[in-house]
A protein has these predicted regions:
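Extreme N-terminal tail/first-helix region
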Residues: 1-16
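Short beta-strand segments
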Residues: 13-48, 56, 62-67
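Helix-adjacent hinge/juxtasegments
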Residues: 52-83
Length: 136
């Protein structure tokens, strides 16, 4: 399980930036997420025909960030992650709809990003303070 500081940070945010790469060309997209604490994974909704999902289906190794936007160096917080994207099922749909009940009306395709590595930067704990998570 991730350190409590990761979980606390992720609970205060709701958008991740997802990076994909196909044919040596990177791409990025923003996605609303629900975070599954027990399994260290993001649950997102996105149409399978979007560029980022098409690329992730070709190459499921993805990376991304969740950040706090601030101009104050002492308040910088952010998480970088690497993981693997897979299509979600009923459990992932339940988790996502718990956070975003209005999404039911759109009946989106649900995906899970299994976090294999993450780094959390939190300058409030001291400049350059970083925590790391690696899935075992």
């Amino acid at each position: 399980m991730m350190d409590e500081k990761f979980i606390h940070f992720l609970a205060r945010h709701h958008v991740l930036n997802l990076s994909t790469c196909n044919n040596n060309t990177p791409y990025a997209a923003s996605c609303f997420y629900a975070y599954d604490i027990e399994n260290a994974r993001f649950i997102v909704a996105s149409d399978a025909n979007t560029r980022h999902m098409q690329e992730a289906l070709e190459n499921p190794k993805v990376a991304g960030t969740v950040t706090l936007e601030t101009k104050s160096v002492g308040l910088i917080q952010g998480m970088q992650f690497m993981g693997e994207l897979k299509e979600g099922g009923d459990e992932e749909r339940r988790i996502y709809y718990q956070c975003y009940p209005f999404a039911r009306a759109m009946n989106p395709t649900i995906w899970q990003i299994i976090v294999n590595y993450a780094k959390l930067t939190d300058n409030r704990l001291g400049f350059g303070n970083k925590l790391e998570f690696t899935r075992e």
